[in-house]
A protein has these predicted regions:
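Beta1/beta-strand and adjacent pyrophosphate-binding region of the FAD-binding site
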Residues: 3-19
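Short hydrophobic core segments
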Residues: 14, 37, 186-195
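Conserved Rossmann-like nucleotide-cofactor binding loop
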Residues: 19, 41-42, 197
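Iron-sulfur cluster-binding cysteine motifs and their immediate structural context
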Residues: 28-42, 90-92, 96, 111-152, ...
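N-terminal glycine-rich dinucleotide-binding loop that anchors FAD/FMN and/or NAD(P) in oxidoreductases
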Residues: 48-85, 127-147, 205
Length: 205
């Protein structure tokens, strides 16, 4: 996080769902420096979990693929996953924002080969599948996840499974010593796009 450079000309977008991603891309393509933060390990938000979405009844993968290509091609846009806003102070045009990043335990050497996931035995409820399926303790959130980098569940750290994951990685991508980090940046504007909660279908009689 120490290499995050921002000025009062920078736009901070909070939330990596379709609204936040769209806002960040559009601003970056207009020439603005943009930092996009998302609390989860990957971008996409609720839309990435849907089968189809209204009104075109398209599969989310279509629009996501286009937007992810735009993100990768734009040097004005910096993406920080597993990051939340801790504090905001200041005024329009000059905000001071504290960002807190939780450890992924996987660094940028990761190629998403999946060897770590095959090596571990621990399983947990899949957040992406609303708890209806299980996922491994070392996992890629979903096939089109951006960044394409595995995550180690923090409940696995300190166990034999964590060491199995590290031993299985040929790229030295597993870093079990990662710690939570905090940094303070200065930005000129903030877009708050933290998403929505789906209706609890259990309430339907």
């Amino acid at each position: 996080m120490s290499d995050v450079i921002a000025t009062n000309q920078t736009i901070l977008v909070v939330g990596g769902g379709i609204s936040g991603v769209t806002a960040a891309i559009e601003a970056a393509e207009c020439g603005k420096q943009v930092i996009l933060v998302e609390k989860n390990p990957s971008l996409g938000g609720r839309v990435s979990q849907l089968y189809k979405y209204f009104p075109k009844l398209c599969y989310p993968s279509c629009g996501m693929e286009i937007n992810l290509r735009r993100i990768k091609a734009n040097r004005n846009l910096r993406v920080l996953t597993m990051t939340e806003v801790g504090n905001v102070s200041g005024e329009s045009g000059n905000y001071s924002v504290t960002l807190k990043t939780t450890p992924r335990y996987v660094n940028e050497n990761c190629t998403a080969c999946g060897e770590c996931g095959q090596a571990v035995e621990a399983e947990f409820d899949s957040e992406y599948d609303y708890g209806m399926k299980k996922r491994k303790g070392a996992y890629l959130p979903f096939n089109m996840a951006y960044p394409q980098r595995y995550v180690l569940d923090p409940r696995m750290i300190g166990t034999d499974d964590a060491e199995k994951a590290r031993g299985a990685c040929k790229y030295d991508a597993i870093d079990l010593d990662m710690q939570e980090s905090e940094t303070t940046i200065t930005v000129g504007a903030i877009v708050w796009a933290t998403g929505w909660q789906p209706f609890d279908a259990d309430k339907i009689q």
